[in-house]
Amino acid sequence: MPADPALPDPVPPGPTAPVPTDYPVRLAVDGAEGPWEALVPGVAALVEQAVLAAVAAGDPSGYGLTPGTPLEISLLLTDDAAVQALNRDYRGQDKPTNVLSFAALDAEEPLPEDGEPVLLGDVALARETVVREAADLGIAPADHVFHLVVHGVLHLLGYDHEEEEEALDMEGLETAILGARGIADPYADARGPEQEGSDR
């Protein structure tokens, strides 16, 4: 029986379905057209899935946010030159990088009133670096984009990798999120066989 044209298409099952989260996310994506869409067809939907997966796994309650609190995230898909400028101006490093995160939430500051959206911050990806890294790693650009967005959003939620224990926690969470989508562990080679079975 043909589908009713008045009804929306069902969400496909499996790893492409949106991940449910207790925190509604208002996501603003800039730059998804043009070169980014050519690189990863459907990139806007892909990055939305990555954001929702990171929020669902990252537990915003650590900031004192209660389930149902709307979260706002801005995501910029741009090029190496723009990311290099951001990296130089805000981090003092005059070079491009794959992803930058600018967290807006501070655990020491008061939260907005109940029901008011909470700005988590901004994430920016550099296209040429993403392409180069994906080629070097032998993985699909779409999988690398998904991983970098997850990584960036986890930074907005307070995760970090400056200390070894923090890095293991963050990498373990990323690996679990990616695994649920069928993406291989990006840290397996760096971890080495002696740590392959460790609790991350």
Curated annotation (Swiss-Prot):
Start and end residues of each stretch annotated as Disordered: 1-22
Record PROSITE patterns: UPF0054
Subcellular location, record wording: Cytoplasm
Keywords per UniProt: Cytoplasm, Endonuclease, Hydrolase, Metal-binding, Nuclease, Ribosome biogenesis, rRNA processing, Zinc
Cited PANTHER family: ENDORIBONUCLEASE YBEY, CHLOROPLASTIC (PTHR46986:SF1)
Gene: ybeY
Pfam families: YbeY (PF02130)
InterPro entries: MetalPrtase_cat_dom_sf_prd, YbeY, YbeY_CS
Gene Ontology, cellular component aspect: cytoplasm
Source organism of the structure: Rhodospirillum rubrum (strain ATCC 11170 / ATH 1.1.1 / DSM 467 / LMG 4362 / NCIMB 8255 / S1)
Cofactor(s) the protein requires to work: Zn(2+)
Protein name, entry field: Endoribonuclease YbeY
Biological-process GO terms, alphabetical: rRNA processing
GO molecular function: metalloendopeptidase activity; RNA endonuclease activity; zinc ion binding
Residues holding Zn(2+): 151, 155, 161
Cofactor: binding details: Binds 1 zinc ion.
